[in-house]
């Protein structure tokens, strides 16, 4: 299976993501922001970083690039899309997932390992976990605080994927740090699963997110 790895100017986790995809037994292929046709891919991962330097606001400029049309077409074909960190903000900008990710309650860059509760395992990326299972992944963001005006709808439609467990390091509403669309095939997450794919680095919980494409 071939998984596209989207690159924007300022993306800095693309190689980590490509390695994680290989560890999951899949074939990664880099795709530039200028590409529109993604139909050859079985799924897409959009790595984090600082797309276009996060000028204006995080994800704003990336949200109007040509590759976004290709991603939307892939969603129509019901192929899985995983957006990590900065891209969670982009997916919110273009309306593929609910809510927005805004500046942390403590407006500083926050980089640490966190415990997370798997709030739903109905997505391809969390299907290997049990509901309410606790996993460990790192976070690294300054604009990762989740907010929505439709929190009850998200709960009713089972669109909350991950929540901080034990502490809420950025002040996110309901400690939410990952959400999905109604189908569960499009997932936006602030934590970095690609940095937790080998026990050597402290946890391999992140590998299951990439095995979800299988």
What function would you assign to each model-found segment?
Residues 1-84, 92-98, 103-110, 117, ...:
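N-terminal beta1-alpha1 cap of cysteine-dependent amidohydrolase-like domains
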Residues 41, 73, 104-214:
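Amide-donor transfer/coupling interface in amidating biosynthetic enzymes
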Residues 49-50, 87, 142, 193:
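Active-site metal-binding loops of divalent metal-dependent hydrolases
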Residues 87-88, 122:
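Short, flexible active-site-adjacent loop segments at beta-strand->alpha-helix junctions, enriched
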